[in-house]
Amino acid sequence: MGVLVAGCGSTGHAESTTAPSTTKTLIPRPLVERELPGLLLSPEQVNAAMGTTDMAIISSQTSLSDHSNTMAPPECLALDGAGEADVYADSGYRAARDHSLNNGDNFTHYAKQAVVLFPLAETARAFFEASAEQWPACHEYRHTQSGTKWYVAELTRDGDILKAITVQRDAGHPGWGCGRALVLRNNIIGDVNTCSADPGDSAVRIAQQIGENVDAVW
């Protein structure tokens, strides 16, 4: 007679010995000063962002500008131009690079792009949030040398980008206005000013590309 022999192994479900999976979030390192020049857009990229041709660098700086004595009131300095020393005073920034560009002697387009280095992402964030509170305090301003008057036509925040449009009063045809954009990425602030008869969102496009350049650096 045949004998049925039962196996000695358990007939229950075996316990898994596989360790649970974990997801690690990589935190980008702070950028350093030598990486700043590579964050700025080329003239060709600025051309594309502004819808023009022949943009060329007319000024390249390794420090912030000071035009505080050419306009009033002071609370509008951040809206009037990019990379202003008084705007960044006491912010804890470490270094800056900027390019100014236009498309010739009788230029119809102007751009300034600045990148400002902070020691940590937290200090860059603090400056950005302070700017988000300060920018709305400006409504109108004037250039004291030329006597031109300007007003803020638009001002909005989209995540980590501040954007504004300022318009010169009585500029004559076809008009003159400037786009402003401030972008936060890691420990870098990108600060952009673009001016033309119709700046649109050209400053935002340049700022977004600066942000992408920051994100590409690890």
Feature roles, as predicted:
Residues A111-A114, V183-S196:
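Short, well-ordered beta-strand elements
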Residues L4-G7:
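C-terminal motif of bacterial Sec signal peptides marking the signal peptidase cleavage site
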Residues Q61-L64, E129-C178, V217:
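Short Gly/Thr-rich strand-loop-strand
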Residues G9, E15-H99:
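N-terminal "mature-domain start" segment
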Residues S91-F128:
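A short acidic-to-branched-hydrophobic micro-motif
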Residues F118-T123, E154-I161, N186:
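A short, structured loop/turn motif at beta-sheet edges
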Residues H109-K112, P174-R180:
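Short, surface-exposed coil-to-beta transition loops
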Residues N193-W218:
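Surface-exposed amphipathic alpha-helical segments
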